Design a protein with these regions (language model features):
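Conserved N-terminal catalytic/coupling substructures associated with nucleotide/phosphate chemistry
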Residues: 1-172, 176-291, 299-341, 400, ...
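Short alpha-helical segments that sit at the start of domains
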Residues: 281-306, 346-373
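Short capping segments at the starts of secondary-structure elements
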Residues: 312-318, 374-381
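Short, cationic-aromatic polyanion-contact patches
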Residues: 339-364, 416-433
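DNA-recognition alpha helix
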Residues: 384-390
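Short coil turns linking two alpha-helices in DNA-binding domains
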Residues: 394-397
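C-terminal regulatory/interaction regions
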Residues: 406-407, 422
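C-terminal interaction modules of eukaryotic adaptor/scaffold proteins
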Residues: 410-413
Length: 433
């Protein structure tokens, strides 16, 4: 119950009281919601449920629980055993998981997943858009199939020596878990869809309602959340569609680190919606190869907290690391301890870092400076480089530098005489820096 003075909700801060913000009021009221999915949907009948969805539920439950006899039970018995049917009445969990399209549209229209695809982030109109208002046991496969089209979820081909991997832009385990979490944790009191915005390099999933009680960005990996739709979540867990409470987020972080992609980003989440973003780009191929070799050689795999620590060390972060994990990784020779309590990844990681090619008579520092020039100019001239290397190289040395870069193919000459300019061949240039 909100504490009010003259109709204004107040919150205690230290010794004093202050007026609560709309966001704080909304969060407190949201926390008082009962389990929506266990609530009876009075008008819903068994005939309103999708037979194919019920069969899928049976199959997945029997497989997950190793109970083949479950397949032979009558539908009503199954619905009752899973607490989707009580005293002849079906609840909203039954509607969300098993309801026919027309039933969902009629009784819970906000139970809808929208996917918008855009070719780039500056586009306001979408390139393609589709909606799925389906029983979840059927809809989740359709949603993933749409996201996973070859043109919108291409494989990233990476290789280093004998190692060759095809990594999807967006990992199936990660995206399915994120979508199912959005369905299970969303607030159904808010009349808005789950919206998935997909780009070639990024995918964002947003759902109504902020984080569940007690969860925030800082503790999302360490707190077991209480889902808003507990009955619904229990069935998703029993049928193997989602991980046990708290482990789904672990899975998303785990796969992102294993594929050396940026961590799941919840930074745009507020009290009214959860906003989760995944990036497609691989940050460090050497780290990906390193992690695959380490995990494949182990009987007991490193957990998500071990991986997070290795990822932080890769990024040069040495603060707030768990000393127990550090000691474990040190003993297993996955990290080395440097002077001043800093850490670095083991030499095995460094073996996967490709050696840069070199140009005789040209230093890497000179190439870095030339590269900086190209960041601000599409093409450069000899005079541009004379300014860049003023006081460092003579005119003759600059001419020699240009000649060697041109011979190696990393720059190309355009124009003649005083109008001569040089453009960069990035595919060749990047091998040297």
């Amino acid at each position: 119950k909100l504490l009010k003075f003259e109709g204004v909700p107040l919150m205690r801060t230290g010794e004093s009281l202050r007026e609560m913000s709309d966001q704080e009021i909304f969060k407190i009221l949201s926390e008082q919601e009962p389990d929506f999915s266990a609530k009876i949907c009075d008008a819903l009948k068994i005939e309103d449920l999708d037979k194919d969805a019920i069969n899928l539920l049976k199959q997945k439950y029997a497989e997950k629980q190793n109970n083949k006899s479950f397949l032979t039970l009558p539908d009503e018995q199954i619905l009752s055993d899973l607490e989707l049917l009580k005293d002849g009445k079906l609840n909203y969990a039954a509607l969300i998981l098993l309801g026919k399209k027309e039933s969902i549209k009629k009784y819970l229209p906000q139970c809808n997943i929208v996917i918008e695809y855009r070719l780039n982030h500056s586009m306001i109109p979408y390139t393609a858009r589709v909606e799925y208002q389906e029983p979840l046991f059927i809809g989740i496969d359709k949603v993933w199939s749409y996201i996973n089209q070859p043109a919108s979820n291409p494989l990233l081909h990476i290789s280093e020596g004998p190692y060759i991997y095809d990594v999807p832009s967006f990992n199936e385990e990660v995206i399915r878990e994120a979508i199912l979490n959005a369905v299970a944790h969303r607030s159904y009191q808010i009349q808005s869809d789950i919206v998935i915005k997909q780009y070639p390099d990024e995918i964002t999933i947003s759902n109504a309602g902020g984080f569940p009680i007690g969860v925030d960005i800082n503790n999302i990996l360490t707190v077991n959340s209480i889902p808003r739709s507990k009955r619904l979540t229990e069935i998703l867990q029993k049928t193997g569609l989602v991980e046990r409470s708290g482990q789904g987020v672990d899975k998303m972080f785990y796969y992102c680190i294993m594929e050396s992609k940026p961590l799941p980003d919840y930074s745009k989440t507020d009290a009214y919606q959860v906003n989760l973003t995944f990036q497609a780009a691989i940050q460090d191929k050497a780290f990906l190869f390193f992690m695959k070799e380490v995990q494949e050689s182990r009987a007991e795999k490193l957990n998500v907290f071990d991986l997070l620590t290795l990822d932080k060390i890769r990024k040069g972060i040495n603060d707030s690391l768990d000393p127990n994990i550090i000691e474990k990784l040190r003993k297993e020779q996955l990290i080395t301890v440097n002077e001043g309590t800093t850490y670095s990844l083991a030499d095995k990681y460094k073996q996967f870092i490709p050696r840069k090619e070199s140009i005789k008579g040209v230093t890497s520092q000179q190439l870095q400076k030339v590269n900086e020039c190209f960041k601000t100019h599409d093409s450069i001239s000899k005079s541009t480089l004379m300014e860049t290397f003023n006081g460092v190289l003579t005119e003759k040395q600059v001419r020699n530098l240009i000649s060697r870069m041109e011979q190696s193919g990393i720059i190309k000459r355009i124009g003649v005489g005083k109008a001569t300019k040089y453009i960069k061949d990035w595919d060749k240039f990047k091998k040297y820096i």
